[in-house]
């Protein structure tokens, strides 16, 4: 199953590189390219006719290429979703908010039953979701997350955490209120990392304890 994730990750990296080439191409023509891919495609659609003909051809080819890549990613997500539905470990993981089929399959493929980690904090640290420490004025302080370990798994957990934040804004249940208060207290990105790290710890517990793990007792 890891081959599926490695190939999917390669498609994602290629997609990012293609969009960056597109940004660079239109920037050479004096057009400021937005970072958002949706905004970039909208802007290109609106302004393409004002670009030189050769640039227009390159833009069309790059967009066609990225469309094929996105179709491949979608197909791999379908395959991984089917696998997740037949794997009891993945099914348990998907009960966590922010953990979908792709993330669940990736965790199972990479860390199995999580027995190589003593606890959930160790897994979160291995994934680079814990803040670095440094000394200033004789005091120990926390810095940015280390971003160590498996970047693919970390990215999936962070993306899942972002979806949790988006969903929480529209709900009033206890968990959603906690998420919203976390954003207010710590800011958006710190809240995203905190939720991703919490999910990493819960994923460890689910994989380590198996059917003995009870989500409500951990959350």
Protein language model features and the residues they cover:
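Non-catalytic, well-ordered alpha-helical scaffold segments
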Residues: 2-5, 9, 16-23, 56, ...
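Phosphate-backbone recognition surface of nucleic-acid-processing proteins
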Residues: 92-95, 101, 105-188
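Short, polar/charged, Gly/Pro-enriched helix-capping and turn/loop motifs at alpha-helix termini
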Residues: 25, 32, 83, 171, ...
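Short helix-capping/linker segments at secondary-structure and domain boundaries
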Residues: 18-19, 73, 112-116, 162-172, ...
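Low-complexity, acidic/Ser/Thr- and charged residue-rich accessory regions of DNA metabolism proteins
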Residues: 137-138, 176-219
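Glycine-rich, often acidic, oxyanion-interacting loops/wings at catalytic, nucleic-acid
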Residues: 3-92, 217
